């Protein structure tokens, strides 16, 4: 069953109109050169960018009209992480659950963060020590911040995970940990610069100069097709 559908959706100058169905529980990798449109496609899929042609449907409804619980079912791990540096690890993790709670709960998170036990649980899942709970994010290393962003995503409990270059600048061990956690989610669309990892996924999408030019199982993608996808021609 398709949970996310793009019908001739596009962004002038960035993405040519495309048709795409992301199915429930499916692990999909998005490949292509820098500037091919991968980040723009992720933005269309989570609603942070609005298609100027066609439409995007989430659970059968226009994504731009989705609110509340339905919209919160899409979680995104951005390449720039989008953490609040001045807040603690727990406060940043709890922000993943803001949509499920009241404004009062959100204000409390800024003053006396609740749900510390839940925070510790998701921190353990991403390999962060409990001692980091009340530590400002600004004091953490790049790899530690990546884990905080992933913990925030897990706290959100999304039905579909979108990730924009989540493995860039990570050492091999951390990259493997992050990829395993993302693939363990119910369904995902992950943008990567690592075609060597495509066999970890069920489906491969390829973007070239803003056009969707590949959509197949990893076993069907040839060396020649990958070379063309990343070529200058």
What function would you assign to each model-found segment?
Residues 106-131:
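Conserved ABC ATPase "signature" region
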Residues 51-65, 70, 125:
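Conserved ABC transporter NBD signature motif
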Residues 136-140, 144:
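Conserved ABC ATPase signature
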Residues 80, 87-107:
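Q-loop/switch helix immediately C-terminal to the Walker
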Residues 61-80, 112, 221:
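ABC ATPase NBD coupling module
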């Amino acid at each position: 069953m398709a949970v996310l559908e793009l019908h001739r959706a596009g962004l002038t100058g960035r993405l040519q109109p495309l048709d795409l169905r992301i199915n429930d529980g499916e692990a999909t990798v998005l490949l292509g050169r820098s500037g091919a449109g991968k980040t723009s496609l992720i933005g269309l899929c989570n609603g942070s960018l609005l298609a100027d042609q066609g439409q995007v449907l989430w659970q059968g409804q226009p994504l731009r009209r989705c609110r509340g619980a339905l919209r919160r079912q899409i979680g995104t791990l951005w390449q720039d992480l989008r953490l609040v540096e001045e807040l603690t690890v727990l406060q940043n993790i709890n922000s993943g659950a803001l949509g499920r709670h009241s404004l009062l709960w959100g204000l409390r998170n800024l003053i006396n963060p609740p749900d510390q036990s839940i925070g510790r649980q998701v921190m353990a899942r991403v390999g962060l020590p409990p001692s980091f709970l009340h530590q400002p994010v600004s004091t953490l290393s790049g790899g530690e911040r990546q884990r905080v962003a992933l913990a925030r995503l897990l706290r959100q409990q999304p039905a579909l995970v979108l990730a924009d270059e989540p493995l860039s600048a990570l050492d091999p061990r951390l990259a493997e940990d992050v990829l395993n956690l993302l693939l363990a989610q119910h369904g995902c669309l992950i943008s990567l610069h690592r075609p060597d990892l495509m066999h970890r996924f069920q489906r491969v999408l390829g973007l070239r100069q803003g056009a969707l030019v590949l959509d197949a199982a990893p076993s069907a993608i040839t060396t020649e097709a990958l070379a063309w996808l990343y070529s200058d021609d």
